[in-house]
Amino acid sequence: MIRKEVFIRNDIEVNEELIYDCSKKVMQLINVDREKIKRKIVQECFNKEFCFQTNNLNKKNDIGEITLSVKNKDISVEFINNSIEKFKQDINLLYDATYLDAPMVIADLDHPFIQRNIVCNHRQDIVKKFLNKNHDISIVDEAIADERLDKVMASLNKVVKGKVNSDRRKIVINIEGVEEPVNIQNLSSGMKSFAILKTIILNGYIKDRSVLILDEPEIHLHPKWQIILADVIIQLQKEYEITCVINTHSPYFLNAIEVFAEKEKISDRCKYYLAEKSGITDVSFSIDRIYELLSDAFDTLDEIQGEE
């Protein structure tokens, strides 16, 4: 029952009609179908991520299915014509995922609308994590993280020895040995990649059992930097038991992951897969198949040289 009174709060008059409207909206929220809200959020996520092109463009009216299986429990979504037809969730995933694919996301750092989006694609998510600290991390968590990250930061500092700072006008990085802060837009693509990863880690978004997805992280990186990045990834996995999904076309980077995993005695945690037209094949016990595929380009060059 709403009391028929006029309330004065902070010099703003709140009348009976406004109170009634607010209470009505609250009741609507309480009674709304939660499954409908969940489906709406998932639909919005896919729309943002795939720009309203989730289904095969040549077969939009066919069922397109995406399934994530964790310990024999599934989260699955079926799409027809880019709209959700069926959504099934047997398990609640409470771990945050961070998807890094290109340093060009730096160009979006000053976009005025990104920070306001509730549902965002993976690049907008990176921008938010780059610019803002994770407020779910306590002071105690930060203190513990400082010790656990010593080796990780030591490796990252071989490439980017400095800290990112931002204000309303620009984002800069203070690099040791450079007299004034460097605008992050002026860094090389490789340094941008390391600066993004380092800042996201320092902001508290890589924590226990986080999910880190790296799409061809070797792009723009010198082979020596690929080795440093592999070391960082293995150290993060060892300290935080993160799930790291990596897509690579670099034999240097793949070999570096193998070497550091063996060095840190976590080779048993690594799985290797080969993407083929017929599907995804587990080649963890026959990794040579990946190297053979990656060496095809060199074989082609050898053939061309042999023709001369």
Enumerate the predicted regions with their spans.
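Walker B catalytic acidic pair
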Residues: 215-217
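C-terminal lobe/lid and adjacent interdomain/linker elements of RecA-like ASCE P-loop ATPase modules
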Residues: 228-308
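Conserved aromatic-histidine-acidic binding/catalytic patches
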Residues: 185, 221, 245
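Phosphate-coordinating catalytic segments in nucleotide- and nucleic-acid-processing enzymes
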Residues: 2-209, 278-308
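Conserved D-loop-proximal element of ABC-family nucleotide-binding domains
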Residues: 222-223, 227
